Regions:
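A cross-family phosphate/adenosyl-ligand binding-site feature
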Residues: 18-86
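Internal, conserved structured core segments that host functional sites
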Residues: 88-137, 145-146, 150
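Hydrophobic/aromatic beta-strand patches that form the interior of the parallel beta-sheet core
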Residues: 35-37, 66, 91, 123-127, ...
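Short glycine-rich anion-binding loops that position phosphate/pyrophosphate groups of nucleotides
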Residues: 42, 71-72, 95-98, 185, ...
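Terminal disorder- and signal-encoded targeting elements
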Residues: 1-7, 30, 303
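A structural-propensity feature for long, helix-poor, extended segments
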Residues: 142-161
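C-terminal accessory domains and tails appended to enzymatic cores
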Residues: 166-303
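Short, glycine-rich nucleotide/cofactor-binding loops
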Residues: 10-17, 104-106
């Protein structure tokens, strides 16, 4: 009896023509039955947004796969409902730049698609590329740059297959989603990369821009990441100072953070839960109400 081939749904947020998607499709197709359902245009930064109500999500079958006029999360829904696919796992990527830091996970379309899959009960891997010589995003990329990313995803899927229970793939570390950041193939660490279990870093802040106000020093900051280019505008932006610090050789970060793993040229693997809850075994307990709290006789106990 021939074993069933594991079915993979492949999507991304950079669009169906993105080189990272094509590179992963090539790598995964050697071992898996791969169906590509991806946005017809770049959807970077939309997070887990979905098209709702009176919005019609159009999709077209192309030589590269199904092109969806919608978000990455829409692509997962189209695959599930409109196309009737029942993949064993969803892979989202490979993104053309890293997706690291807790605040970025909420903004990333790559991670958003993976989360959408987990809401529908399918394990998912979000994978992104980083090039330490061209942060945050390399100016040009080709298939070869994603070679290590393909190898890492195939390895993680293989582990999930070996841990399968009742035919369902089981991601490592008990995760619903793995957020994975992988070095480019020409990185000196890429020949034998270290896998590092990480948590999304939490260091970021809000920058306020005021017309005519002097911005922070922008020495050694790549084009497009300066603060001074925003002079003359009024507004706010959630901006991660990490890249500026990294480019200056100053990286204050906690051991175990996804950002520090990137600095060290490692494969960062952050296990994520789709529930986003930390109640754990205490879920369902009764918490004393306001009357008890007002009397000073009550508080939410911690173990």
């Amino acid at each position: 009896m021939t074993a069933m081939t594991t079915e993979i749904l492949l999507t991304n947020d950079d669009g169906i023509d993105a080189v990272g998607l094509r590179a992963l499709a090539d790598a995964l197709s050697r071992d898996y039955d791969v169906t590509v359902v991806a946005p017809e245009s770049n959807q970077s930064g939309v997070g887990g947004a979905r098209s709702w109500w009176d919005t019609t999500v159009e999709y077209t079958e192309t030589g590269a796969g199904y092109a969806v006029d919608g978000t990455p999360a829409d692509c997962v829904a189209v695959a599930d409902v409109a196309l009737g696919l029942d993949p064993d796992a969803v892979v989202s990527g490979c993104n053309h730049g890293p997706n690291i830091g807790a605040h970025i996970l909420g903004q990333s379309g790559t991670v958003g698609a993976a989360m959408e899959a987990s809401f529908l009960g399918t394990p998912a891997i979000a994978v992104s590329l980083y090039d330490r010589g061209n942060l945050p995003v390399p100016p040009t990329l080709d298939n070869g740059d994603f070679a290590v990313a393909g190898e890492v995803v195939v390895d993680l899927l293989g582990r999930a297959e070996r841990a399968a229970a009742d035919g369902d793939l089981a991601l490592p570390f008990g995760a619903d989603v793995l957020n994975v950041n992988v070095p480019a193939a020409d990185d000196e660490t890429a020949a034998d990369p270290t896998y590092r279990l990480t948590e999304p870093a939490r260091g970021f802040d809000v920058i306020e821009f005021r017309p005519g106000e002097e911005g922070p020093e922008d020495e050694n900051v790549p084009e497009g990441w300066e603060f001074n280019e925003r002079r003359g505008e009024m507004g706010m932006e959630l901006r991660d100072r990490f890249w500026r610090e990294f480019l200056r050789g100053d990286v204050p970060d906690d051991p175990g953070s996804d950002r520090l793993a990137v600095v060290e040229g490692e494969v960062s693997i952050s296990p994520l839960s789709s529930s986003r809850s930390i109640a754990g075994d205490r879920a369902g307990e009764v918490v004393n109400g306001p009357a008890e709290a007002a009397s000073g006789a009550s508080r939410i106990e911690q173990d």
